[in-house]
Amino acid sequence: AEIGKTAEGRVMLMAIITSPENHKKLARYKEISRRLALADGVADDQARSMAREGKAVVWIDGGLHATEVLGAQQLMEMVYRMVSMDDPETLRILNDDILLAACANPDGMDLVANWYMREPEPPKRSTAGLPRLYQKYIGHDNNRDFYASNQPETEAINRIFYHEWFPQIVYNHHQTGPAGTVLFAPPFRDPFNYYFDPLVPMGIDLVSAAMHNRFLAEGKPGATMRSGSGYSTWWNGGLRTTVYFHNMIGLLTESIGNPTPVRIPFVPQNQLPRIDLPAPIAPQEWHFRQSIEYSVTANRAVLDVASKYREEFLFNIYRMGRNSIERGSRDHWTIHPKVIAAVQEAVAKERASGGEERGAAGGGGRGGAFRFGAAPAKYYEMMRDPANRDPRGFIIPADQPDFLTATKFVNALIKTGITIHQATRSFQVGGKSYPTGSYVVKTAQAFRPHVLDMFEPQDHPDDVPYPGGPPRPPYDSAGYTLAFQMGLKFDRVLDGFDGPFEKISGFAKAPAGKVSVSLSPAGFL
């Protein structure tokens, strides 16, 4: 199916791979996936019923970063095998799953392929020295665009994710792997982002275990995880990370491999097995075919676990959406590192003043509530300060200086599946008046984590192994807060509110500008 056009006008194609019987009911399965993901108006028993009826929807892509040539090649291999094999496992997967397979950057794939083949002698071929960006406007940062949807490729993929298919699992292939290994595969290192549902990292762990188990069962050593590299789940903006804020399981592998053979180097510390590298691999020459086989193994592990836990994945995306709606409908607090630091500081002051000697409020003899790292229960109330509640919504006034940019911001949210309302007349909230046309973004919706992450300040934890030790930086930018980046004027509303609001259908339309004519102009622009 065609899902859009690239920046250079090429067609973006997505293969929909499932059984012939499922193809006859694709519209129904798409509707089930949508209703479960959005969760609004769906009761638990209805969700259970739809989860039993539905099919697991899994997205697998390749080629987003075009010089990471393995991605596009393994994708073609995988599609061929899924439509040609008839073994029992493949047939079960085709019955239980709907695979969405797409090349994420066709422009880049053509550019890199032509550049590589310019050299007539195969041993001399290389993708190095590419003469221009492999995405016309943003190159490598096409994987930092999925919160803003600036590029047509991004917009097309986000439409599949957040408006049409709502996959439960999204697998994004990349290169290259850490030195002395074949690939990095999840699970990821801490921290995960505090806004998204804890079922997201638990779902990642479930799928990741299936991947690593299959590598070992097939005799494919050299897969590392967690501390084996720096990848985390904190940041928004990437193809596989923005999905976390939409209650989806996002996967990343970073694999070695090149059409021209490479060598796995000897890294001594990576020859000692550990929990994050259970099966080291010996230094050796490495061929592209081997990398493709590892990628296919990973793909099939994902599809296999999606098949076996189909109902759980479908119900859990509903559960996460329902949790978000409920949290946005009542007082709720997201606990951040600064809150914990404030509590610890208060506890330390009490200890220093002799509270520990008196047993404080906890009783139990000397040390009382302070024993074993505990603190008096009264300090828990600091974490429930009414002033620190999560917002129930955000109001973007129509009378701000740059309402055109505010409209662009709102449309970026709409492209990522966020429900936006607009005031049909002036209104008041919390004693403040707002004009007609103001935008309203409520947090009582399934994709609440994304709303909060686009508006709220970031508080990435200090990642220091020990006091005075070297800090470990975030994998990517710690904040993708689009409202700050675009200079938006908005108000946080901590209590429930309503007004003359109408849901925006399609995209928001900015008001027409005015041209003022002076009778005695000083000049023209």
Model-inferred region functions:
Residues 109-110, 179-182, 262-264:
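Short acidic/His/Gly/Ser-rich catalytic and metal-binding motifs that mark active-site loops
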Residues 161-176:
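Proline-aspartate-enriched helix->loop->beta-strand connector
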Residues 1-97, 138-139, 144-145, 150-152, ...:
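Intrinsic-disorder/low-complexity accessory segments
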Residues 6, 101-106, 116, 172-180:
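Short, solvent-exposed turn/loop segments enriched in Gly/Ser/Thr/Pro and often Arg
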Residues 89, 94-144:
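Divalent-metal coordination cores built from histidine and acidic residues
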